[in-house]
């Protein structure tokens, strides 16, 4: 929105030309989202406490988690508010890629909100019925997938980028829709599974968003895209502002979510953030790099799949408890140790993924 205003005012006040620079708007995006989160946090926490909207803890979970009962949840409202306000302030709202990410972010946020509401207000520990949750996740992802395919059909926007091979970029055709669907839904649920310890999910989300900010800038810059042998997609550059908003909002939320947490993001936050990251990965054509950068999310998800599969096939569990962060807790690791080590691994994976851009 501000960029529209600056286009008018710069003829009278040259200072407003600064808002045309992507880097300047990205910095302002981080600051704005961070400020909104820090300002909103205490108010939201008090409001949630007054409504007695507290975390539901499983009786069969680690004993260390029993003390978390009653901690305010649905803090993802803070994250989504900060991101939404920031994006509408600093992003170019004529860019369809911005709207695609925001549609998924808010759509999945709505699904997560209903799920959280049923859990903590209606006292239904199962939350939203699984088939309905999956239905709405699928519907939102398919709407975006079909829209993006129609918009970018037979262009660089629908090519498959294979790491390490600069000349292998086949057109996906209708397979693009299927891939987009699985990436968005899969990433959303992976982040949701990871959100089990104080600050565990938000920092990897911040790291991945920061990595995608660089990739979005490179993809939107024709010279840098050619240098790295990745598709040049002009619209992708505006996603830098969106990624910056996620980073700022994430840091602001971490202020209150760090151990011991004052608030949890809930499904309203984790489903939305995961869906947004998946959408960004699709838009910049780096689905494979998402698997590397989001390796923590991938491992958490695989641990659940392997645990359930092993128990059903062999009657035995592989881990003491899944997702895998609970396995390490039950092995005696203090919660902060699990969290920080997963953060370190996540940061390294993002750096490795960015390094692969040059290895072609």
Swiss-Prot record:
It is a multi-pass membrane protein. Coiled coil: none annotated. The gene is mraY. This is Phospho-N-acetylmuramoyl-pentapeptide-transferase. One of its GO terms (molecular function) is phospho-N-acetylmuramoyl-pentapeptide-transferase activity. The keyword Magnesium applies. Keywords: Cell cycle, Cell division, Cell inner membrane, Cell membrane, Cell shape, Cell wall biogenesis/degradation, Magnesium, Membrane, Metal-binding, Peptidoglycan synthesis, Transferase, Transmembrane, Transmembrane helix. Its EC number is 2.7.8.13.
């Amino acid at each position: 929105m501000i960029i529209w205003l600056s286009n008018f005012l710069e003829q009278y006040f040259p200072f407003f030309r600064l808002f045309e620079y992507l880097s300047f708007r990205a910095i302002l995006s981080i600051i704005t989202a961070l400020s909104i989160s820090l300002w909103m946090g205490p108010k939201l926490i008090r409001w949630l406490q007054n409504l007695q909207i507290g975390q539901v803890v499983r009786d069969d979970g680690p004993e260390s988690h029993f003390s978390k009962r009653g901690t305010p949840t649905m803090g993802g409202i803070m994250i989504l508010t900060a991101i939404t306000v920031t994006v509408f302030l600093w992003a170019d709202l004529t860019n369809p890629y911005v709207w695609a990410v925001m549609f998924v972010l808010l759509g999945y946020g709505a699904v997560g909100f209903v799920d959280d509401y049923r859990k903590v207000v209606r006292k239904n520990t199962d939350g939203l019925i699984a088939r309905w949750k999956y239905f709405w996740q699928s519907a939102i992802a398919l709407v975006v997938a079909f829209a993006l395919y129609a918009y970018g059909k037979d262009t660089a926007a629908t090519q498959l980028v294979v790491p390490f091979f600069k000349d292998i970029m086949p057109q996906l055709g209708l397979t693009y829709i299927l891939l987009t669907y699985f990436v968005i839904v899969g990433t959303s649920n992976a982040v949701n599974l990871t959100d089990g310890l104080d600050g565990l999910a938000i920092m990897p989300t911040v790291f991945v968003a920061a990595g995608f900010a660089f990739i979005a800038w490179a993809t939107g810059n024709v010279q840098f895209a050619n240098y790295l042998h990745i598709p040049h997609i002009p619209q992708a550059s505006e996603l830098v502002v969106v990624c910056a908003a996620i980073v700022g909002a994430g840091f602001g939320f971490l202020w209150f979510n760090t151990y011991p947490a004052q608030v949890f993001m809930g499904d309203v936050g984790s489903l939305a953030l995961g869906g947004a990251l998946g959408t960004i990965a699709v838009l910049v054509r780096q689905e494979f790099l998402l698997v590397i950068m989001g390796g923590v999310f991938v491992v958490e998800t695989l641990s659940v799949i392997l645990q359930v599969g092993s128990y059903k096939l062999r009657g035995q569990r592989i881990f003491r408890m899944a997702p895998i962060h609970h396995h390490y807790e039950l092995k005696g690791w203090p919660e902060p140790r699990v969290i920080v080590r997963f953060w370190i691994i996540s940061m390294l994976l993002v750096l490795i993924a960015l390094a692969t851009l040059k290895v072609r």
